[in-house]
A protein has these predicted regions:
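Amphipathic, well-ordered alpha-helical segments in soluble domains
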Residues: 7, 11, 34-41, 83, ...
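Conserved phosphate/anionic-ligand binding catalytic regions in large, soluble enzymes, centered on
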Residues: 17-40, 144-162
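Preference for long, well-ordered alpha-helical segments
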Residues: 129-132, 144-203, 207
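A structural-propensity feature for long, helix-poor, extended segments
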Residues: 50-89, 189
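Amphipathic alpha-helical interface segments
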Residues: 80, 84-153, 157
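Short, hydrophobic/aliphatic alpha-helical segments
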Residues: 3-22
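Transmembrane signal-anchor/signal-peptide helices with a preference for the extracytoplasmic
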Residues: 41-53
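Amphipathic alpha-helix face/heptad-repeat signature
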Residues: 30-34, 62, 69-76, 115-125, ...
């Protein structure tokens, strides 16, 4: 099932169902994509306005980056669902013999690593979305500054939620050093971009 081909209602019905995917990871990617789309909205409302002629080239460049970023996050909605399937399959492998147990452990470890990789990609993309939102808030139409603030908040929430999906998988890993490295990367992204998102929100809300 191609999740991005579903209607909004169809996606939400799948999300609300007992199906294992989509779940928090896919929803995070979708929320991030919505945040980036809000940034693009600011750009669309700015381009062509005489008042913003001095920054038009900058806004056009932002719009190109934002469109590519939104497409990346849309693809990650599907990628997250597909990354979960091997984890679920690994748990169903037999473990009657030592050989089966070793095989199951190896397959599960590999699947968990991939299940961490996708939400880390979502986090990275959302960080880029927050940076874009900051530029849209600074240079875009004042009539749409609240949308730039919403863009930053959406991407922040999506990043934090994706971070939870990293942790839920690293906690199951046998290779604790690798798990710690993945968690450290997630924490680094949060430390870098959450304050930036908060600054965008404050600058918009205090106007």
């Amino acid at each position: 099932m191609e999740l991005m081909n579903l209607s909004c209602e169809g996606f939400l019905e799948e999300l609300a169902s007992k199906a294992a995917a989509p779940g928090g990871g896919g929803a995070s990617a979708l929320v991030g994509a919505a945040g980036v789309a809000l940034g693009s909205m600011v750009g669309s409302l700015t381009v062509g306005k005489k008042k913003y002629a001095a920054v038009e080239a900058d806004i056009v460049a932002l719009n190109v980056r934002a469109e590519a970023l939104r497409k990346r996050l849309e693809a990650l909605v599907q990628a997250d669902a597909e990354a979960f399937l091997p984890v679920a399959a690994a748990y169903k492998l037999p473990k009657e013999t030592p050989e089966q147990q070793a095989h199951k452990a190896a397959v599960l470890e590999k699947a968990l690593d991939r299940a961490c990789a996708v939400p880390l990609e979502v986090m990275t993309a959302c960080g880029e979305g927050i940076a874009l939102a900051a530029e849209y808030a600074e240079k875009g139409s004042v009539l749409a500054r609240s949308d730039a603030g919403c863009a930053a908040l959406f991407c922040k929430a999506a990043m934090q939620a994706a971070g939870l999906n990293v942790k839920v998988n690293t906690r199951l890993m046998a290779d604790k050093a690798h798990a710690d490295a993945l968690e450290a990367r997630a924490e680094q992204l949060l430390a870098e971009f959450v304050p930036q998102a908060d600054m965008v929100y404050q600058s918009v809300s205090n106007e």
